[in-house]
């Protein structure tokens, strides 16, 4: 097995007609609409979970936390991320770095990015220097540009620990 493994994750959630905040990177961000989701709808943490699971060839977030399971209804995605990290550690993987890109026309993410990085680093038991989060728009194109939802991509590097 290779010592280094790379995974990519993607998630998207549509805005709902109700709510007054969204959760991204474990941070509550005021917004005129919430996100439609079975859990808390944290697209960043969901994409990161998928990237980590993919790098380890463990499947995807839906396999481990299915939206058909009522126990995950309204779930805090930070708990999901911590569970994924625990699975990785049990199999001898160490997180090298994580890079996430939030795609949203609104709300502005820049004021919240440092708090997101702190949360992710804490939940992954890594230095904040191993976590990068950035945000972009689609210049008003597509569903994110029309403010219909938020998407996120994430890439993760894992290192398999030698036995």
UniProtKB/Swiss-Prot annotation:
CDD domains, sorted: MECDP_synthase (cd00554)
Record flagged with keyword Lipid metabolism: no
Domain of life, per lineage: Bacteria
Cofactor note: Binds 1 divalent metal cation per subunit.
Function noted in UniProt: Involved in the biosynthesis of isopentenyl diphosphate (IPP) and dimethylallyl diphosphate (DMAPP), two major building blocks of isoprenoid compounds. Catalyzes the conversion of 4-diphosphocytidyl-2-C-methyl-D-erythritol 2-phosphate (CDP-ME2P) to 2-C-methyl-D-erythritol 2,4-cyclodiphosphate (ME-CPP) with a corresponding release of cytidine 5-monophosphate (CMP).
Subunit structure comment from the entry: Homotrimer.
Protein name stated in the entry: 2-C-methyl-D-erythritol 2,4-cyclodiphosphate synthase
Organism field: Hahella chejuensis (strain KCTC 2396)
């Amino acid at each position: 097995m290779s010592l280094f493994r790379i995974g990519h994750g993607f998630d998207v959630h549509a805005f709902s007609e109700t709510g007054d905040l969204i959760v991204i990177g474990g941070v509550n961000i005021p917004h005129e609409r919430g996100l439609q989701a079975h859990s808390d709808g944290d697209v960043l943490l969901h994409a990161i979970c998928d990237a980590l699971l993919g790098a380890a060839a463990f499947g995807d977030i839906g396999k481990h936390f299915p939206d058909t399971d009522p126990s995950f209804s309204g779930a805090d995605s930070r708990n999901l991320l911590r569970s994924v990290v625990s699975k990785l550690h049990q199999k001898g993987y160490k997180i090298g770095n994580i890079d996430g890109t939030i795609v949203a026309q609104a709300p502005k993410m820049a004021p919240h990015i440092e708090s997101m990085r702190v949360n992710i680093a804490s939940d992954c038991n890594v230095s904040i220097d191993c976590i990068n989060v950035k945000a972009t728009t689609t210049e008003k194109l597509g569903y994110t540009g029309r403010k219909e939802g938020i998407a996120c991509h994430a890439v993760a590097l894992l290192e398999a620990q030698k036995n």
